[in-house]
Design a protein with these regions (language model features):
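Residues in well-ordered alpha-helical elements
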Residues: 62-65, 84, 91, 102, ...
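The catalytic Tyr-centered alpha-helix of NAD(P)H-dependent dehydrogenases
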Residues: 132, 143-150, 180, 184-188, ...
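Short aromatic-enriched loop/helix-cap "lid" or pocket-rim segments at secondary-structure transitions
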Residues: 41-44, 127-131, 182-185, 216, ...
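C-terminal substrate-binding subdomain of Rossmann-fold SDR/epimerase-dehydratase oxidoreductases
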Residues: 56, 73, 195-331
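Hydrophobic alpha-helix immediately C-terminal to the catalytic Tyr-X-X-X-Lys motif of short-chain
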Residues: 153, 157, 161, 191, ...
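N-terminal Rossmann-like NAD(P)+-binding domain of SDR-like oxidoreductases, especially those catalyzing
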Residues: 1-177, 307-311, 317, 321-329
Length: 331
């Protein structure tokens, strides 16, 4: 299969490229990435001789059309994704997550190419902490941040292009990912690298907010399954059913790194911070017979800590800038 992977130098996209190269060596992989601060050429060093990297913007219609015409399928990871950045400056999120997705859709429509669109559970808003409900494919959209609103907009465009133009597309909405190559602005790698650089870890508010954690490799194996077996026009929710509150995750991480479990600072909470995300992945499990392999969160977290310990040359160049940005925001 000739795959075009947008955002393939970012966290989830780079891991998808690595797994594709190793598990599907017959595939040819082209990565389209603008290499903004969160997309890094170094994330593809281990597979650079097995892929083609094209540096460009997904809103460049001519470039996108050319690359899509050479492909059998597009896996669309490219997105601006950090909520704090969206609250401070939403324009890049509209540019990439909405206009970029429109550009991809027009290209796959023109050339008749299969598309899988990667999205987030944040489009559904949040749940109360003690609410037994979980998100399903039929939960109404209720985004609560500029980031999730732009991702919801992209999802709606995909659905409209499927119905109006017969585009062969699927959508997946996934819960919070963790694993290698995640930018140090994100919750888990920020805390790991704070410890490794002698900084105190930081926790928004009380830390009661709940996230549904999944290892990035499990997310990507589900994406591959949907790409190959998913029903056109269908949305699938991806989850390893790993709900944990942020305080518990931080304390677990600190203990694994030899620190006292309360050796961190509480900082000002994010405006409108979503309380709880929880996904019901029953459709994916029952229809496509997918299941996660990394079901032991503590083991996955320990492996992630080990990866950051062993790959300081990857994260160290961006760490100081990320923390300076957090200082500006008072977090």
């Amino acid at each position: 299969m000739r795959l075009l992977v947008t955002g393939g130098a970012g966290f989830i996209g780079a891991n998808f490229v690595h797994s594709t190269v190793h598990e599907y060596p017959e595939d040819s992989v082209t990565v389209l990435d603008s290499l903004t601060y969160a997309g890094r050429r170094e994330s593809l060093d281990g597979v650079k001789d097995a892929i083609r990297l094209v540096v460009g913007d997904i809103t460049d219609a001519e470039l996108v059309s050319q690359l899509v015409a050479e492909s059998d399928a597009v896996v669309h990871f490219a997105a601006e994704s950090h909520v704090d950045n969206a609250l401070d400056d939403p324009e890049p999120f509209l540019h990439t997550n909405v206009i970029g997705t429109f550009t991809i859709l027009e290209a796959v429509r023109r050339h008749g190419v299969r598309l899988h669109h990667i999205s987030t559970d944040e489009v559904y808003g949040d749940l109360e902490l003690n609410d037994p409900k979980r998100f399903t494919e039929w939960t109404p959209y209720n985004p609560s941040s500029p980031y999730s609103a732009t991702k919801a907009g992209g999802d709606m465009l995909v659905r409209a292009w499927v119905r109006s133009y017969g585009v062969r597309a699927t959508i997946s909405n996934c819960s919070n990912n963790y694993g290698p190559y995640q930018h140090v602005e994100k919750f888990i790698p920020r805390q790991i690298t704070n410890v490794l650089t002698g900084r105190r870890p930081k926790l928004y508010g009380s830390g009661a907010n709940v996230r549904d954690w999944i290892h990035v490799d499990d997310h990507n194996s589900a994406v591959r399954r949907i790409l190959e077996k998913g029903r056109i026009g269908q949305t699938y929710l991806i989850s390893a059913e790993g709900e944990r509150d942020n305080l518990t995750v931080l304390r677990t991480l600190l203990q694994m790194m030899g620190r006292e479990p309360d050796d961190f600072d509480h900082v000002t909470d994010r405006v409108g911070h979503d309380l709880r995300y929880a996904i019901d992945p029953s459709l994916l499990y029952s229809e496509l017979y997918w299941a996660p392999k990394h079901t032991d969160f503590e083991e996955g977290l320990r492996d992630t800590i080990d990866w950051y310990r062993a790959n300081e040359s990857w994260w160290r160049p961006v760490k100081d800038a990320a923390e300076a940005r957090y200082q500006q925001l008072g977090r």
